[in-house]
């Protein structure tokens, strides 16, 4: 997820139980032009393995060259191709979900990456179920990707036109899993252990992928594992623990070489901080305050005030 799954957040998710992770997606053209900012999106630590680097683009040969270049920098455990991003600026460059409308071009991209990688690491794909409700072609696309050498496919159960509205269509995801021999990983509307258990029970998927739920609740990985292993629903994480993690994330972001000065790091963190506030007492006011922070100290003060107010409330 662009702007979300950076090296710092992946570290946090790994500590909280994530099994396999993928970097923010990177432009193949940015990689080929030796853009330093783009290269930073591919960074990961060995502690985060297994981890894949996700690429997007519309030219199979260039995508393959970019994948090979990434492997030369620091070999990821796999290369993932993005056929799912619905964002206009990506679609306009014939990347992401735009290729779902053009299966020959999609096949050329998948084959190009597989050829460029040459078996050095597995190549996987992330996709949506179609461009819109009239062109749901996920089963066809999965078969094409399997023929092109993909070794696993993650399917998000919405069309490009849906964005993140409506419900994920797990019937289509199930049909994809039954149509190919390679693993299909289901994604969409997974926010708890109960959600994961239901989808694993009711569909033929080989695995499940948690996305947006982790943005406000990175404990979801640990909670889901506990439910799958024991059937027990974990107690909600205490507000104090939540703020401790928020502050740790801020400090890690500031010390990360990616963001530079503290002010820039905290400005980049604003959207992340607002996401963390989901379910916090007084979340609306907190988001308004966090949208303006420029230092860790400001977040510390906001956290202290939030905890003090919660302690004074009848339910605190």
Language-model segments: what does each one mean?
Residues 21-23, 51-55, 79, 123-127, ...:
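Hydrophobic faces of well-ordered beta-strands that scaffold small-molecule active sites
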Residues 34-35, 102-103, 217, 261:
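Short, solvent-exposed helix-helix connector turns and helix-capping sites enriched
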Residues 15, 61-95, 99-182:
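Alpha/beta enzyme core
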Residues 2, 7-8, 15, 116, ...:
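Alpha/beta catalytic cores of nucleotide-metabolism and tRNA/nucleoside-modifying enzymes
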Residues 28-30, 86-87, 161-162, 193, ...:
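Short secondary-structure capping/turn micro-motifs that flank functional sites
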Residues 32, 65, 90-91, 195-196, ...:
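Short glycine-/acidic-enriched loop or helix-start segments at secondary-structure transitions
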Residues 26, 84, 158, 189, ...:
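Flexible loop residues that form catalytic
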Residues 1-77:
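Glycine-rich, positively charged N-terminal anion/phosphate-binding segment
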């Amino acid at each position: 997820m662009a702007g979300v799954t950076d090296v710092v957040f992946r570290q946090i998710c790994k500590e909280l139980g994530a099994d396999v992770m993928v970097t923010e997606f990177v432009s193949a053209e940015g990689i080929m032009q030796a853009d330093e900012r783009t290269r930073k999106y591919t960074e990961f630590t060995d502690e985060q393995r297994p981890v894949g680097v996700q690429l997007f683009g519309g030219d199979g040969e260039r995508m393959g060259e970019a994948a090979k270049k990434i492997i030369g920098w620091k070999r990821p455990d796999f290369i993932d191709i993005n056929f799912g991003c619905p964002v206009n600026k990506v679609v306009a460059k014939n990347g992401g979900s735009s290729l779902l409308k053009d299966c020959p071009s999609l096949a050329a991209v998948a084959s190009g990456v597989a050829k460029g990688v040459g078996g050095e690491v597995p190549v996987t794909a992330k996709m949506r179920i179609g461009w819109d409700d009239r062109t749901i072609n996920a089963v066809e696309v999965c078969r094409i990707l399997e023929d092109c050498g993909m070794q696993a496919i993650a399917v998000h159960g919405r069309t490009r036109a849906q964005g993140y509205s409506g419900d994920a269509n797990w019937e289509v995801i199930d049909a994809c899993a039954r149509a190919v021999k390679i693993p299909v990983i289901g994604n969409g509307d997974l926010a708890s252990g109960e959600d994961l258990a239901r989808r694993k029970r009711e569909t033929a998927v080989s695995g499940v992928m948690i996305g947006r739920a982790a943005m406000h609740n990175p404990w979801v990985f640990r909670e889901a594992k506990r439910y799958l292993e024991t059937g027990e629903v974990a107690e909600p994480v205490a507000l104090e623990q939540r703020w401790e993690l928020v502050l740790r994330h801020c400090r890690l972001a500031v010390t990360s070489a990616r963001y530079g000065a503290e002010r820039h790091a905290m400005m980049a963190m604003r959207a992340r901080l607002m996401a963390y506030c989901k379910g916090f007492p007084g979340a609306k006011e907190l988001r308004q305050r966090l949208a303006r922070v420029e230092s860790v100290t400001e977040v510390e003060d906001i956290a202290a005030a939030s905890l003090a107010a919660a302690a004074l409330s009848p339910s605190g």
